[in-house]
């Protein structure tokens, strides 16, 4: 009865297998949730999946559920630890066995160490969640920056191409203006040479007219015989002078026209020079703008390279975090196996306690049986001593009585005495023990001394 009660108590304290199956299902669920989180983190790191608000909300809900499960498991562990402490106190109060206490202390220390490891794992899990949120925000920032840089890169080449086209057009116009300027310079030089030649001819004709004018009065003073020749010469000179004057007028007109054209060409040349200067300034400013634009592009490329390096570093950190999460999963699995081993050890300890209680009960029962048998033997020995004393007294009285009887009866008395001696001789202790009776103190049922075990069973049944 007592052994059954202890078994039931141990079963009620330690629980049964459904709780273990429930904890296993919760652990499997946690493993599935962690695997799903790993896949989502892999999708984020690979850049294939972009987190929407709905998915982020769903992940936050899953994280909250996991935290609730973690708190629930922690509460269950604390309750089990309290139960273990209470059972240990009960065992310490009931039994003074040092080995069991040492084993229980070792198991409690192991449980405390595992609780510390679980706390550390939960803290690392929180850190991983924070790093994951920071990494997702950083990836979102990097994606927005890369999109803006791509847009700027698509806009910048168009502007650069248009500016390059404008520069090429301006260079072509400048080359045309320089060629025209060179042609105008050559033409101007040729016109100056031509004008100088005309002026020299005009100067020579003027000299000839002057010499002809000085020679006319001298020729009139000559004799009239030479008059006809002189008139002919005068006509020739007049014709030459008129033609020279006409040529001079024509040349003067051409000179004025050429000077006007020269002034026009100079004005155009100055305008072209101004245009060339303006184009040079515009080209210089355009080149400076292009250099600035190229410098900005270089800075942008450096920034893009830096962002790519930061992205690579973030991916490396994510890989490290993935490895750490895998290590944590392996540690969780190891802890799960160790918890299973601990539960097996606890069941073994419970079985050992049960066996020890059964052994102690059997020992107590045997001790009580032995004490009762010793008491019965002591009583039987006392009764045996009393019987022996009574027999000796009766024998002495009988001998005195037989001495008073007549002599003829001596022989018959001797025979009867021998018979009585044989009959009254002390029996062996085993025979006396077999003939002695033991009775129940409650219902007064008698049992032989050899059947003392049956008497004990009867007493236990009768005392109920």
Swiss-Prot record:
Residues 22-186, 238-337, 374-403 form a coiled coil. The modification Phosphoserine is found at residues 96, 425, 428, 436. InterPro entries: CEP55, EABR. The modification Phosphothreonine is found at residue 430. Its main location: cytoplasm. It is found in: Cytoplasm; Cytoplasm, Cytoskeleton, Microtubule organizing center, Centrosome, Centriole; Cytoplasm, Cytoskeleton, Microtubule organizing center, Centrosome; Cleavage furrow. Plays a role in mitotic exit and cytokinesis. Recruits PDCD6IP and TSG101 to midbody during cytokinesis. Required for successful completion of cytokinesis. Not required for microtubule nucleation. Plays a role in the development of the brain and kidney. PANTHER family: CENTROSOMAL PROTEIN OF 55 KDA. This is Centrosomal protein of 55 kDa. It comes from Homo sapiens (Human).
